[in-house]
Amino acid sequence: MLRQYTTGSYGPHEEGPGIAEIRTHLPDDEASSRMALLASGFADPGRIRLLSALAGGAVCVGDLALALSVSQSSVSHQLRLLRSVGIVSSERRGRHIYYSLAWPGAAKVLGDLQGAIEGSERWQDPAMAGDNIQEEE
Protein backbone atom coordinates (compact mmCIF):
# COMPACT_ATOMS: atom_id res chain seq x y z
CA MET A 1 0.00 0.00 0.00
CA LEU A 2 1.34 3.40 -0.97
CA ARG A 3 1.22 6.25 1.49
CA GLN A 4 0.29 9.44 -0.33
CA TYR A 5 1.21 12.87 0.99
CA THR A 6 -0.42 14.83 -1.84
CA THR A 7 -2.94 14.04 -4.52
CA GLY A 8 -1.85 12.73 -7.87
CA SER A 9 0.04 9.77 -9.16
CA TYR A 10 3.54 9.56 -7.68
CA GLY A 11 4.00 13.30 -7.61
CA PRO A 12 6.27 15.18 -5.23
CA HIS A 13 5.97 14.06 -1.62
CA GLU A 14 4.33 10.72 -2.40
CA GLU A 15 5.68 7.31 -1.56
CA GLY A 16 6.41 5.47 -4.78
CA PRO A 17 9.16 3.66 -6.71
CA GLY A 18 11.34 6.79 -6.77
CA ILE A 19 11.37 6.96 -2.97
CA ALA A 20 12.39 3.30 -2.75
CA GLU A 21 15.29 4.05 -5.11
CA ILE A 22 16.40 7.00 -2.97
CA ARG A 23 16.36 4.78 0.11
CA THR A 24 18.80 2.33 -1.49
CA HIS A 25 21.45 5.07 -1.25
CA LEU A 26 20.88 5.86 2.43
CA PRO A 27 23.16 4.44 5.13
CA ASP A 28 21.41 2.95 8.14
CA ASP A 29 21.19 4.97 11.38
CA GLU A 30 24.25 3.36 12.97
CA ALA A 31 26.41 3.90 9.89
CA SER A 32 25.18 7.51 9.64
CA SER A 33 26.18 8.13 13.26
CA ARG A 34 29.61 6.60 12.74
CA MET A 35 30.14 8.59 9.54
CA ALA A 36 29.17 11.84 11.31
CA LEU A 37 31.59 11.04 14.13
CA LEU A 38 34.39 10.44 11.64
CA ALA A 39 33.53 13.64 9.75
CA SER A 40 33.67 15.61 13.01
CA GLY A 41 37.41 15.01 13.04
CA PHE A 42 37.69 17.16 9.91
CA ALA A 43 35.25 19.84 11.09
CA ASP A 44 37.77 22.26 12.58
CA PRO A 45 40.43 24.37 10.82
CA GLY A 46 43.00 23.54 13.49
CA ARG A 47 42.38 19.81 13.14
CA ILE A 48 42.65 20.07 9.35
CA ARG A 49 46.09 21.65 9.75
CA LEU A 50 47.07 19.04 12.34
CA LEU A 51 45.97 16.16 10.12
CA SER A 52 47.80 17.72 7.18
CA ALA A 53 50.97 17.82 9.26
CA LEU A 54 50.54 14.13 10.11
CA ALA A 55 50.03 13.19 6.45
CA GLY A 56 53.82 13.32 6.08
CA GLY A 57 54.42 10.74 8.81
CA ALA A 58 54.66 10.35 12.58
CA VAL A 59 55.31 13.53 14.59
CA CYS A 60 55.58 14.20 18.33
CA VAL A 61 53.35 16.73 20.11
CA GLY A 62 56.14 19.24 20.70
CA ASP A 63 57.11 19.34 17.03
CA LEU A 64 53.46 19.64 15.99
CA ALA A 65 52.97 22.55 18.40
CA LEU A 66 56.03 24.34 17.01
CA ALA A 67 55.09 23.70 13.38
CA LEU A 68 51.50 24.87 13.89
CA SER A 69 52.39 27.76 16.25
CA VAL A 70 49.95 26.62 18.93
CA SER A 71 50.36 25.38 22.49
CA GLN A 72 51.22 21.77 23.26
CA SER A 73 48.07 21.50 25.37
CA SER A 74 45.95 22.60 22.39
CA VAL A 75 47.66 20.05 20.14
CA SER A 76 47.26 17.32 22.78
CA HIS A 77 43.56 18.11 23.16
CA GLN A 78 42.94 17.89 19.41
CA LEU A 79 45.00 14.70 19.11
CA ARG A 80 42.94 13.06 21.88
CA LEU A 81 39.77 13.91 19.96
CA LEU A 82 41.21 12.61 16.68
CA ARG A 83 42.40 9.43 18.37
CA SER A 84 38.99 8.87 19.96
CA VAL A 85 37.34 8.86 16.52
CA GLY A 86 40.03 6.59 15.07
CA ILE A 87 41.71 9.00 12.67
CA VAL A 88 45.10 9.10 14.41
CA SER A 89 47.11 6.63 16.46
CA SER A 90 49.98 7.06 18.88
CA GLU A 91 53.21 5.24 19.62
CA ARG A 92 55.58 5.82 22.52
CA ARG A 93 59.23 6.16 21.55
CA GLY A 94 61.30 6.67 24.66
CA ARG A 95 60.03 9.75 26.46
CA HIS A 96 57.97 11.02 23.53
CA ILE A 97 54.68 9.99 22.00
CA TYR A 98 54.49 10.12 18.22
CA TYR A 99 51.20 10.50 16.39
CA SER A 100 50.38 9.39 12.87
CA LEU A 101 47.34 8.88 10.67
CA ALA A 102 45.68 5.61 11.70
CA TRP A 103 43.18 5.70 8.86
CA PRO A 104 44.83 5.76 5.41
CA GLY A 105 41.71 7.39 3.96
CA ALA A 106 42.37 10.55 6.00
CA ALA A 107 45.05 11.76 3.59
CA LYS A 108 42.65 11.21 0.67
CA VAL A 109 39.89 13.15 2.44
CA LEU A 110 42.32 16.03 3.04
CA GLY A 111 43.34 15.96 -0.62
CA ASP A 112 39.72 15.86 -1.78
CA LEU A 113 38.85 18.82 0.46
CA GLN A 114 41.84 20.75 -0.84
CA GLY A 115 40.83 19.95 -4.41
CA ALA A 116 37.26 21.08 -3.74
CA ILE A 117 38.28 24.51 -2.48
CA GLU A 118 40.81 25.00 -5.27
CA GLY A 119 38.34 23.98 -7.95
CA SER A 120 35.43 26.22 -6.99
CA GLU A 121 35.01 29.95 -6.48
CA ARG A 122 32.33 29.17 -3.90
CA TRP A 123 34.95 28.02 -1.42
CA GLN A 124 37.51 30.76 -2.09
CA ASP A 125 35.74 33.22 0.22
CA PRO A 126 34.56 31.77 3.56
CA ALA A 127 31.65 34.26 3.58
CA MET A 128 30.41 32.75 0.31
CA ALA A 129 30.49 29.30 1.87
CA GLY A 130 28.24 30.51 4.68
CA ASP A 131 30.86 30.02 7.37
CA ASN A 132 32.98 32.41 9.38
CA ILE A 133 36.40 30.78 9.61
CA GLN A 134 38.72 32.44 12.10
CA GLU A 135 42.34 31.65 12.71
CA GLU A 136 43.44 30.70 16.22
CA GLU A 137 45.79 33.19 17.81
Question: What does each model-identified segment do?
Answer:
Residues 66, 77, 83-84:
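Alpha-helical residues within the helix-turn-helix
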Residues 60-62, 85, 121:
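Functionally engaged cysteine thiol sites
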Residues 1-34, 103-137:
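Amphipathic alpha-helical dimerization/coiled-coil segments
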Residues 83-93, 100:
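Beta-hairpin "wing" of winged helix-turn-helix
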Residues 73-80, 92:
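Recognition helix of helix-turn-helix DNA-binding domains
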Residues 29-73, 97-106:
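N-terminal helix-turn-helix DNA-binding core of bacterial DNA-binding proteins
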